[in-house]
């Protein structure tokens, strides 16, 4: 069992895994565990510090979440964030109650006492609040380190016991010096910067070899970053026992199937088995409008196709997937985070399947996956491709998926990507795609009235996909995209731009 420098106990915040990501960026290996994990399991990880995450519950409620009491008797530094802060206060006898003024968004943090936790942090900085409860009194043995306009006890601590409590979220990018504070906490814990993708690759290769033995692994690839890195990692570990399969589900972008085959065969040197199952997928999606049903159908059909292919080969015991940490958090596998949406590659395999899962990327973030890809020798054009969802264009078409709607979306999507690349904006953004709204609107083309489809452009900036902001594209670029799509794609007469951030919206529409 791998030791963790810092354990993050998950009380249900959608930001929880950002805490681990921020620490890992600084070379500190942080691992998530459910809030109710046993003290024995915590001790087995031999952590140097513990972080209590935020969460949607209230410490005074009947259904409040509490961690094992032993957490506070280990003698380790503890950092409580938001709900974790209120839990620290509650456990030390302070009153926590509903706030008269809820705080959501940016706030000014004012430091009133300097200490190691605030090393490198200015006296006043912007932090990100997201809470509806308030600590009304200072716990015994603690002192105030910082306040905000609406929070007298915004940061308090017991410096002797190294217990720190923050009302805000340092892990969110909007907190200007949040990274610095987390780095300082890691130093207080005595952590060193030893976590990197080079060491991860070596350990993962060895773990894969030990697990697989003489059995074979069926690796599903889509051409996206995640599956490409999984295939490369497995090729390093078990080149003779690896079967790489690409399924054309009929939900890919223009020429994508051909590009995937060329990439794996020519650039990665992988013997790729290509299966055209487009008719099967589209037939099963016929008449289906609900996004969750679409995801489930696509996921189940993928598994079925892979299982059929696996039976053609002897000793196939495992199926490899590119499941990431962000997939897990949005499907609420860890801790008590509330479900946002299911992911096609999260949740295990059906009982009828005859092989087990291998998910070597399950505990790392997208930025770590990219660094791992470079470490494994993949080219930058592969590693820095925009993310593309497993369910493909099916979740970028509102409502029913059919060949005509797919064709419209493909044509619009090509134009968007062409314009972004020619203007130099493609590499500046995290993800860019079109959404076919399946909503008609009135237009005028020439002297004729039209009543045709509207398409939405979705372009976002992000570092890990956990949070995202819409890209501030130049108006001229947006105008070019709109003009070309309307003029070149028959059946579309309106283009809109999505200016929603995540949260509250998700990046994909379905």
UniProtKB/Swiss-Prot annotation:
It comes from the Bacteria. The keyword Amino-acid biosynthesis does not apply. The active site is at residues 82, 169, 171. The keyword DNA-binding does not apply. PROSITE patterns: GATASE_TYPE_1, GMPS_ATP_PPASE. Residues 5-194 form the Glutamine amidotransferase type-1 domain. Pfam families: GATase, GMP_synt_C, NAD_synthase. Coiled coil: none annotated. SUPFAM superfamilies: Adenine nucleotide alpha hydrolases-like, Class I glutamine amidotransferase-like, GMP synthetase C-terminal dimerisation domain. Its EC number is 6.3.5.2. Catalyzes the synthesis of GMP from XMP. Homodimer. This is GMP synthase [glutamine-hydrolyzing]. It comes from Campylobacter fetus subsp. fetus (strain 82-40).
């Amino acid at each position: 069992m791998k030791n963790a420098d810092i354990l993050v106990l998950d009380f249900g915040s959608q930001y929880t895994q950002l805490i681990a990501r921020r620490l890992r960026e600084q070379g500190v290996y942080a691992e998530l565990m459910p809030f109710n994990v046993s003290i024995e399991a915590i001790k087995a990880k031999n952590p140097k510090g513990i972080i209590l995450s935020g969460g949607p519950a209230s410490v005074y409620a009947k259904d409040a979440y509490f961690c094992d009491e032993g957490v506070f008797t280990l003698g380790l530094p503890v950092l409580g964030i938001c709900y974790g802060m209120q839990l620290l206060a509650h456990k030390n006898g302070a009153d926590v109650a509903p706030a008269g003024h809820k705080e959501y968004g940016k706030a000014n943090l004012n430091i009133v006492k300097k200490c190691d936790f605030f090393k490198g942090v200015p006296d006043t900085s912007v932090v990100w609040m997201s809470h509806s409860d308030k600590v009304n009194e200072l716990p015994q043995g603690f002192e105030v380190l910082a306040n905000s306009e609406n929070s007298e006890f915004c940061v308090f601590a017991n410096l002797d016991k190294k217990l720190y409590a923050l009302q805000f979220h340092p892990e969110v990018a909007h907190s200007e010096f949040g990274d610095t504070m987390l780095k300082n906490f890691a130093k207080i814990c005595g952590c060193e910067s030893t976590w990197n993708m080079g060491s991860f690759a070596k350990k993962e290769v060895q773990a894969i070899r030990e697990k697989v033995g003489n059995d074979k692994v069926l690796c599903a690839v889509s051409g996206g970053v995640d599956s490409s890195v999984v295939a490369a990692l497995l090729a390093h570990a078990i080149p003779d026992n690896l079967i790489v399969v690409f399924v054309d589900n009929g939900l890919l972008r223009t020429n994508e199937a051909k590009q995937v085959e060329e990439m794996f065969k020519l650039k990665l040197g992988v013997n790729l088995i290509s299966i055209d199952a487009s008719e099967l997928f589209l037939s099963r999606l016929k008449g289906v409008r609900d996004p969750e049903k679409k995801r489930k159908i696509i996921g189940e059909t993928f598994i079925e196709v892979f299982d059929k292919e696996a039976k053609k080969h002897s000793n196939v015991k495992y199926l490899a997937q590119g499941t990431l940490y962000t997939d897990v958090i949005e499907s609420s596998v860890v801790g008590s985070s509330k479900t946002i949406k299911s992911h096609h590659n999260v949740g295990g395999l059906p009982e009828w399947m005859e092989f087990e899962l291998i998910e070597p990327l399950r505990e790392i973030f997208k930025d770590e996956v990219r660094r791992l890809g470079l470490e494994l020798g993949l080219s930058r054009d592969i590693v820095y491709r925009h993310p593309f969802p497993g369910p493909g264009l099916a979740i970028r078409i509102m409502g029913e998926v059919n060949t005509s709607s797919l064709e419209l979306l493909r044509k619009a999507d090509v134009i968007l990507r062409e314009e972004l690349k020619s203007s130099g904006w493609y590499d500046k953004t995290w993800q860019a795609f079109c959404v076919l709204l399946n909503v008609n609107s009135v237009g005028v083309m020439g002297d004729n009235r039209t009543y045709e489809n509207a398409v939405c452009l979705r372009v976002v900036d992000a570092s890990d996909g956990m949070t995202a902001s819409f890209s501030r594209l130049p108006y001229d670029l947006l105008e070019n995209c709109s003009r070309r799509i309307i003029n070149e794609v028959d059946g579309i007469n309106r283009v809109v731009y999505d200016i929603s951030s995540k949260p509250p919206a998700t990046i994909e529409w379905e």
